A protein has these predicted regions:
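Alpha/beta enzyme core
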Residues: 5-17, 29-54, 61-78, 86-198, ...
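Poly-acidic low-complexity segments
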Residues: 6, 25, 60, 154, ...
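Residue-level signal for pocket-adjacent positions within structured domains
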Residues: 16-19, 135, 176, 206, ...
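A short N-terminal beta->alpha junction/helix N-cap motif
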Residues: 19-27, 52-56, 256, 260
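Histidine-centered catalytic micro-motifs
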Residues: 22-26, 81-86, 109, 201-211, ...
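An acidic- and aromatic-residue-enriched active-site/binding cleft used to recognize and process polar
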Residues: 138, 208, 232
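C-terminal alpha-helical cap/extension of soluble enzyme domains
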Residues: 212-278
């Protein structure tokens, strides 16, 4: 009997309930700890995301991936480890060998035909190992530091891409941009509904830090199933540290202030997961 990949299973369950799964990026070990603890507070599954930038920061995938996998294993709720925006196919293979739960392969910089070909190869590789695959058709706004809220995914092209590649989830451009520090973006809800009707797999919203709570709920109600958030949580983490050090510049033990960032991310993770599941 073939077991359905964990990410595909929890996304399908959320899609049936018109809810969404939160996927939050790991930067430091404390992020993984905070996100898993926040998920336990909310009683909801969560996805720990590791990007190529994170891999470069930690000078390799194994240190942060293995630590995240151990945190996930010890959690009292379902916590998955996911590789986010991976362009390096060798890194995908390393992730498969390490035992990650899912991969977002990003071939959006390639030509359409090459994107389809390489995404199909990655999907076949990962599915053989019981790992789910997310992909992207064309760039979501904000790549290379350029916000492009006008970018939109065509439903017919999205449906054809999913059929050709066999991916389990699709990241779509519906008005958000990566790395936004203000929550002022808006989602094209009508387009989300059209994409949900056209595409037979769960839809993924990248760049969700730029959305208010109302916009997040609207995106979920319109058909988004996986909500990626990073910058918003990083801002909370950083502001917590800065506030402490502004008052106590004499403190040199990093545990005394890094734990405040961890606590802030934990609290907001729990709140966001409850919002997405409402």
């Amino acid at each position: 009997m073939i077991t359905r990949p964990a990410l595909a299973r929890i996304l399908a369950s959320a899609r049936e309930r018109n809810a969404a799964v939160g996927a939050f990026n790991v930067i430091l070990l404390e992020h993984a700890e905070a996100i898993a603890s926040g998920a336990e507070q909310a009683g909801a599954p969560v996805v720990l995301q590791i990007s190529e930038n994170c891999v470069r920061y930690h000078r390799g995938l194994a240190p942060i991936a293995l630590a995240s996998l151990e945190i996930a294993k010890r959690a009292k709720v379902e916590v998955l480890v996911h590789l986010d925006h991976i362009e390096d196919q060798d890194l995908v293979r390393e992730g498969v060998d390490l035992g990650v739960d899912s991969v977002m392969y990003d071939g959006s910089r390639l030509s359409y035909d090459e994107n389809v070909r390489t995404t199909r190869e990655i999907a076949d590789l990962c599915h053989a190992a019981g790992i789910a695959v997310e992909a992207e058709l064309g760039e979501v706004g904000g790549k290379d530091g350029v916000h492009a809220p006008g970018a939109r995914t065509d439903p017919a092209e999205a449906a054809a891409f999913v059929k050709a590649t066999g991916v389990d989830a699709l990241a779509v451009a519906v008005g958000t941009s990566h790395a936004m520090v203000s929550r002022t973006a808006s989602v094209d809800r009508a387009l989300v509904s059209r994409l949900r009707d056209a595409v037979g797999v769960p839809l993924v919203l990248h760049g969700s830090s730029g959305l208010s709570d109302d916009e997040l709920r609207g995106a979920v109600e319109s058909g988004m199933t996986k909500i990626n958030i990073s910058t918003h949580l990083n801002g909370l983490f950083t502001r917590s540290l800065k506030a402490f050090l502004d008052e106590r510049p004499d403190v040199v033990d990093p545990r005394k202030y890094v734990r405040l960032g961890r606590a802030a991310v934990e609290e907001e993770t729990a709140r966001l997961l409850r919002l997405l599941a409402a």
